[in-house]
């Protein structure tokens, strides 16, 4: 790997001899200095000394000026000095000594390569990406090449205003993406023919596992039928999930399924199936329903544009992958899975869901609905452990549907189907046998000649097929297939006719699905939004209108505790849309993805060095998925040791809600551990719990630093205690941003962690996903890491893998270059510095705010970690002001709220990250101090306790510019409460405060159909939609 400017000499010329161009036409290029110590002849050692002297002079003349860490870390030297002075400290080293226990501090620098220049990182990544070979892949199995509209790529996927938003917990500043996600839900509901859909899940396979769990929850039965013609990765993920949920999965063809025992919770089938066959499942659905079993259909949205939807033959749950709606393959992800249900199952549905409610003025608005069923509230009793899903990719798919409309989607579907019909006819003419007569886009072919010969000809054209175990070949076509592609496919199979000649021989008679009883006749996407933005001009304006409604990192800091909303730099994000990363099918042979393999290996090596673990699995594609995978790995390890009875998992009460939800998913029995008044694990209670459950102890789940924002002094003792009693230590990586370069979980006793790459390592949050949650493990757990049924991702000898946890072998592969680039550009020193500044920023803010709010928890020497909790509970009694009032009022100051009422109800948790400079920290602190003064005004009777800027917040532009203003405070106080909040730079909430209760009581989670717009809108029609 090349070094930066200091390792290069400057040379005039045209770049002869392999120099790397600085810029076209400049006549300048870089040439690497010789490392030959011989001096090159008669000059002897003097030549070396002259070269060394020249080098030092050159470094002085051409000092490095593109140190990425200086771009990533907000506070400069002056800011740091001032913050340290405010804390009464002489240096950052002193701060770290007083914050992080000496017993766990890393005594050496991280062993990592020197940082790569920001300008050079893209060149290095280009070299890696070029090792990926972009063949035409007709493998299918839920993954298809597609045409990504450039307007969506540029204005959404590559737009920081869309990708740096957080999950829309604050709807008043999130109406844009909430509307887009409602469009996505409507799209899914319409196309599948079901009543309600959620706002995305992680991938098709995990959506199928969630469907199985829903069936099990619904009727408490413990047998689940799976049609073996589902995609193999889907079957594997369902089997892995079922193993720890006590559900028996049986692979049965429909005619083999016996429901007479009334012990079957549900059945899963694929429509069209993995071989491409379209068949009628009506009879199976009816048989299942007669005995109270639910039916789950894995399906394809594009196929359903011309194929009878599952909702029309009684299916209860439909699921699948929306990837082919304008989202790149990306070697497996990220993609948005869809999940739709009948209305009677909506309150059991996993994942986030957008619904309609009203704001304080009565205006219809959007919000996240039914949150009481989610992990952050219900913990181990939640419908799922899902936290981050795939909002950004769901938004892309929704925009794809909006851009094309129903007619455009039908056109694409018919084109794909017609191409498949032409290919099928040509193959039959060439003497090959098709296994199925009715299909959409996939053919299973019994070759009439040598398969080896066919595959050899395919390799000549750089084309991939699917090879079935029985020696047949699978060919799945997509919307990018051209006439030339068809000609190449026909040539590979020895057909002497061209696609044009085959088509002419077929004529225009309706064939295939369009001439069968399976043809779709019902309308879909009738809502106005899918019929208004078919020109690029209109779509760009619509996307911009939505973007402008949402606060993101382009506006101001997002101080959400435990969320690490740091910079997502352009250099890190740029490579994810390169075709060498974007256009690779996840199941291509490994020799076609050598660039990806090199990147995985390098990232794994760096993450192991950073964490102290020995191996990393990249398969989990979210933090919650990583928790489940890590705990399941522990279960597999204990099972192999003959300790299957160990199922108790200890979890502190301060833990994130995903912890107990994930432990429950892994089949563990949760035992809560108390937290003392200082925010630490109550060691006495922990010891009592360990002693009580020592025979059955499987693990403890801890977060470090704790969710209360402190480095607990006795973390090593806690880990040792668990190990002494036969348990394993799972350390939640949510707060890894306070550890990198300073301490390593693998050194102080942790056995496994998930790493939130979308927090610590700069993958953007995307408004609610994507995320990545790879797990790092110590050596003894490495043989149990996840495997995959299609692609071998680890040696099989001496391993007992836990199973498969995600659809793709390496999860959401295409966003891993972001974290790789961040680590390479920062280097070991820069990564440690980022951690130090994150801790400095948090302590500076805590210091500024401590005179106005109580800082709830501090470490042993009075300092916080990278985040801290402000106690707003006393204001409920003194002024009838709650945390939610402070959160909404912050919107008027231009800020997203901190994490609200977690981990302690009635509080606010603040995490500034290292990317924010002192000026931004001060603006936020000024806002909080100003709000405290507004609370004091209520306490002291200077303003009305019911009608005041806090209770009436946020103040939208419509509100402030209304001709009627009857509030006992001025418009200026409402909208411009401090000098830095100015008309020219203010972010405006677009609605008044929402009514959560009304939204859950009047659940509407799709857009109404076009008929609504034929007459004045009515509540009755909206409810019936």
From Swiss-Prot:
Group of enzyme by EC: oxidoreductase
Transit peptide: 1-35
EC number of this enzyme: 1.4.4.2
Protein activity control: Stimulated by lipoic acid. Inhibited in presence of methylamine.
Single GO biological process annotation from the record: response to lipoic acid
Gene Ontology CC, one term: glycine cleavage complex
Record InterPro entries: ArAA_b-elim_lyase/Thr_aldolase, GcvP, GDC-P_C, GDC-P_N, GDC_P, PyrdxlP-dep_Trfase, PyrdxlP-dep_Trfase_major, PyrdxlP-dep_Trfase_small
CC cofactor: pyridoxal 5'-phosphate
Biased composition range(s): Gly residues: 38-50
Database matches in Pfam families: Beta_elim_lyase, GcvP2_C, GDC-P
Keywords tagged on the record: Acetylation, Mitochondrion, Oxidoreductase, Pyridoxal phosphate, Transit peptide
Main location: mitochondrion
Reaction catalysed by this enzyme: N(6)-[(R)-lipoyl]-L-lysyl-[glycine-cleavage complex H protein] + glycine + H(+) = N(6)-[(R)-S(8)-aminomethyldihydrolipoyl]-L-lysyl-[glycine-cleavage complex H protein] + CO2
Subcellular location: Mitochondrion
Region of interest: Disordered: 16-51
GO molecular function terms noted in the UniProt entry: enzyme binding; glycine binding; glycine dehydrogenase (decarboxylating) activity; lyase activity; protein homodimerization activity; pyridoxal binding; pyridoxal phosphate binding
Record-listed N6-acetyllysine modification sites: 452, 519, 653, 669
Sites of N6-(pyridoxal phosphate)lysine modification: 759
NCBIfam families reported for this sequence: gcvP, PRK00451.1, PRK04366.1
Function: The glycine cleavage system catalyzes the degradation of glycine. The P protein (GLDC) binds the alpha-amino group of glycine through its pyridoxal phosphate cofactor; CO(2) is released and the remaining methylamine moiety is then transferred to the lipoamide cofactor of the H protein (GCSH).
Subunit structure: Interacts with GCSH. Homodimer. The glycine cleavage system is composed of four proteins: P (GLDC), T (GCST), L (DLD) and H (GCSH).
UniProt family annotation: Belongs to the GcvP family.
Annotated protein name in UniProt: Glycine dehydrogenase (decarboxylating), mitochondrial
């Amino acid at each position: 790997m090349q070094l930066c400017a200091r390792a290069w000499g400057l040379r005039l010329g045209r770049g002869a001899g392999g120099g790397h161009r600085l810029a076209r036409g400049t006549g300048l290029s870089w040439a690497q200095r010789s490392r030959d110590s011989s001096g090159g002849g008669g000059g002897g050692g003097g030549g070396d000394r002259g070269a060394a002297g020249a080098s030092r002079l050159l470094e002085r003349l051409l000092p490095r000026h593109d140190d990425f860490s200086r771009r990533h870390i907000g506070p400069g030297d002056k800011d740091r000095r001032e913050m340290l002075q405010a804390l009464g400290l002489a240096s950052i080293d002193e701060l770290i000594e007083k914050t992080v226990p000496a017993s766990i501090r890393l005594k050496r620098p991280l062993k990592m390569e020197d940082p790569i220049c920001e300008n050079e990182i893209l060149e290095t990544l280009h070299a890696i990406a070029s090792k990926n070979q972009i063949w035409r892949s007709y493998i299918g199995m839920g993954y298809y090449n597609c045409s990504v509209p450039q307007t969506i790529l540029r204005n959404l996927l590559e737009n920081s205003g869309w990708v740096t938003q957080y999950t829309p917990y604050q709807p008043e500043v999130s109406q844009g993406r909430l509307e887009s996600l409602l469009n996505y839900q409507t799209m899914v509901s319409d196309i599948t023919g079901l009543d309600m859909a959620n706002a995305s899940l992680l991938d098709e396979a995990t959506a199928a596992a969630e469907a199985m769990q829903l069936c099990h929850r619904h009727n408490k039965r413990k047998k689940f039928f799976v049609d073996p013609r589902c995609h193999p990765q889907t079957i594997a993920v369902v089997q892995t999930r079922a193993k720890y949920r006590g559900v028996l999965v049986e692979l049965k063809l429909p005619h083999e399924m016996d429901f007479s025992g009334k012990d079957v919770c549900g059945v899963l089938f694929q429509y069209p199936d993995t071989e491409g066959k379209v068949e009628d499942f009506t009879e199976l659905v009816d048989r299942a329903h007669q005995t109270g079993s639910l039916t789950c259909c894995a399906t394809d949205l594009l196929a359903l544009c011309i194929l009878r939807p599952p909702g029309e033959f009684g299916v209860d749950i439909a699921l699948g992958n929306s990837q082919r709606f304008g989202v790149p393959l990306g070697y497996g992800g990220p993609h948005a899975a869809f999940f739709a249900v009948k209305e009677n199952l909506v309150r059991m549905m996993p994942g986030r869901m957008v619904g309609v409610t009203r704001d304080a003025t009565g205006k219809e608005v959007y919000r996240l609905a039914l949150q009481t069923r989610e992990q952050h509230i219900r913990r181990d009793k939640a419908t799922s452990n899902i936290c981050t899903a795939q909002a950004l990719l769901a938004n892309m798919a929704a925009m794809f549907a909006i851009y094309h409309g129903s007619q455009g989607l039908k056109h694409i579907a018919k084109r794909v189907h017609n191409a498949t019909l032409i290919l099928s006819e040509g193959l039959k003419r060439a003497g090959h046998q098709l296994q199925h007569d009715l299909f959409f886009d996939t053919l299973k072919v019994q070759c009439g000649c040598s398969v080896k010969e066919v595959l050899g000809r395919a390799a000549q054209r750089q084309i991939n097929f699917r090879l079935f175990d029985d020696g047949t070949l699978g060919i799945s076509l997509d919307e990018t297939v051209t006439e030339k592609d068809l000609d190449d496919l026909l040539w590979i199979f020895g057909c002497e006719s061209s696609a044009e000649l085959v088509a002419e021989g077929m004529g225009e008679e309706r064939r295939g699905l369009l001439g069968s009883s399976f043809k779709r006749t019902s309308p879909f996407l009738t809502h106005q939004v899918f019929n208004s933005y078919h020109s690029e001009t209109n779509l760009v304006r619509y996307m911009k209108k939505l973007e402008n409604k949402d606060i993101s990192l382009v506006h101001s800091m997002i101080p959400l505790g435990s969320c690490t909303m740091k910079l997502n730099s352009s250099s890190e994000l740029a490579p994810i849309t390169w075709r060498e990363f974007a256009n690779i099918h996840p199941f291509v042979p490994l020799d076609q993805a050598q660039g990806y393999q090199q990147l995985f290996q390098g990232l794994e090596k760096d993450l192991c060095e950073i964490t102290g673990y020995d191996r990393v699995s990249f398969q989990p594609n979210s933090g919650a998925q990583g928790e489940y995978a890590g705990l399941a790995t522990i279960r597999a390890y204990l099972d192999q040791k003959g300790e299957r009875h160990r199922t108790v998992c200890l979890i502190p009460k301060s833990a994130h809600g995903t912890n107990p939800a994930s432990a429950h998913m892994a089949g563990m029995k949760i035992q809560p551990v108390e937290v003392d008044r200082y925010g630490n694990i109550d060691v006495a209670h922990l010891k009592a719990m360990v002693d009580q459950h020592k025979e059955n102890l499987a693990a403890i789940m801890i977060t470090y630093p704790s969710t209360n924002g402190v480095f607990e002094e006795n973390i090593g003792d806690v880990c040792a205690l668990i190990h002494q009693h036969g348990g394993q230590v799972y350390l939640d990586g949510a707060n890894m941003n306070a550890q990198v370069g300073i301490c390593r979980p693998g050194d102080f006793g942790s056995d496994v962690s998930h790493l939130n790459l979308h927090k610590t390592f700069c993958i953007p949050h995307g408004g609610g996903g994507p995320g990545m949650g790879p797990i790092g493990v110590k050596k003894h757990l490495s043989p149990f890491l996840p495997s995959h049924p299609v692609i071998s991702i680890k040696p099989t000898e001496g391993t007992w893998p836990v199973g498969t946890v995600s659809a793709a072998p390496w999860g959401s592969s295409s966003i891993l270059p972001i974290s790789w680039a961040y680590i390479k550009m920062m280097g070991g020193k820069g990564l440690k510095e980022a951690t130090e500044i994150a801790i400095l920023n948090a302590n500076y803010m805590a210091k500024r705010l401590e005179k106005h709010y109580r800082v709830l928890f501090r470490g042993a020497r009075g300092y916080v970690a990278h985040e801290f909790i402000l106690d707003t509970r006393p204001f409920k009694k003194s002024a009838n002001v709650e945390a939610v009032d402070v959160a909404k009022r912050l919107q008027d100051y231009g800020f997203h709220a901190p994490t609200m009422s977690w981990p302690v109800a009635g509080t606010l948790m603040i995490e500034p990250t290292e990317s924010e400079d002192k000026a931004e920290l001060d603006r936020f602190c000024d806002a909080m101090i100003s709000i405290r003064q507004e609370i004091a005004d209520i306490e002291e009777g200077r303003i009305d306790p019911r009608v005041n800027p806090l209770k009436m917040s946020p103040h939208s532009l419509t509100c402030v510019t209304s001709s009627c203003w009857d509030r006992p405070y001025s418009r200026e106080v409402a909208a411009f409460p401090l000098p830095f909040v100015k008309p020219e730079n203010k972010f405006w909430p677009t609605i008044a405060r929402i009514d959560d209760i009304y939204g859950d009581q009047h659940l509407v989670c799709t857009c109404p159909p076009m008929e609504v717009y034929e007459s004045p809108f009515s509540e009755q029609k909206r409810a019936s939609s």
